[in-house]
């Protein structure tokens, strides 16, 4: 039994809207019939191209089934995830968030690539989550005000541009020379340079330095100190409007909570070396919420990988639930291996966009293609991508056919959908605005549609 976010009936939409509640009720109507007739050979597939809707819908379905004593297996997937790193990151955010909580029996990673490219991605994702099984118990409590089914962003008091109503920040690690050389290209909010000051401080850049260096620096402009937990007693001795403090679950709560309450200028850098880092990092933030502490939290994740795809999958899977739970005020990805800093930074921004927390580029929703696709899907995606890549904030659907395309790209602002041999239809939202136009003209007419409708974006 499958339910897609973009294909709900008018009856369901009129009552629930395009919401997780509507998706779940649409599924439960059929499951109740199956249960009534004692039919158990059922697998459920709940999908959306929106990772937040997908995860919340599956969580709500599991809760609803439990209440009605149903225990059908679940198939997981982020529909029409796209291609390349974006498709992998989006899939890992959604699927990983559920697998990490023990939800899911089969998965599919839906990529606009050759079908055989999907299997290694899916296998690595499952294998990575499986490594966390059998871990030592994390003796944590859940904050009673936290709603796992309908989570809202954790309330924090902003420190400069971190927390509060700000979008989550991106932190990166660079040595001093790299920071001086690459920072013009970097879009990161904070650059950690450790114990070495950059040779030249670029205007608008923010540098995180070890607290000892901060104390010694004559010119502290654009510098922000970071303290390991062992240096917590020195926090009060250092004057700065923003301080970072590295913490992990298991630090004596009475010590670090008192420090955070006394110093609202602290941003917590939450780390973990636990086998189940998600559980450990969740535990620290819930401990803070129980104590009423509202300091922002940046999640720092450390890897030792040489393969960029593995890095993207693992980092996205680790961050998925933390973002969807509303706990994330920033991400800091680090890697001890042969992966370029630009790839690490790009992955961080990609994860935030996949989690619907921060938009940094155009988003593409595209199907894998099938026998009904009557045009060169991958070549068309490349041409549309090249022409629209700078249209930050737009979601563009590129679908092979009209059978599932309009429904499965329901979250897109604009759509390019195969309508027959040599014919394309263009969509604005869910409305078809140009029917059966020649394929050779379709990309240009899509651009014209965007530029006419969104001149502030389309004419960049």
Question: Model segments located where?
Answer:
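A structural signal for short secondary-structure junctions
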Residues: 102, 162-164, 326, 388-391, ...
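Active-site loops and adjacent core secondary-structure elements that bind or stabilize anionic groups
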Residues: 126-238, 242-249, 262
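Nucleotide-binding motor/catalytic cores of P-loop/tubulin-like NTPases across gene-expression machines
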Residues: 402-408, 412-432
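Radical SAM enzyme core and accessory elements
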Residues: 179-184, 415, 422, 426, ...
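Catalytic alpha/beta core domains of metabolic enzymes, predominantly
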Residues: 4-159, 242-244, 249-391, 395-398
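Beta-strand/loop-dominated core regions that host nucleotide or nucleotide-derived cofactor-binding catalytic loops
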Residues: 421-424, 431-455
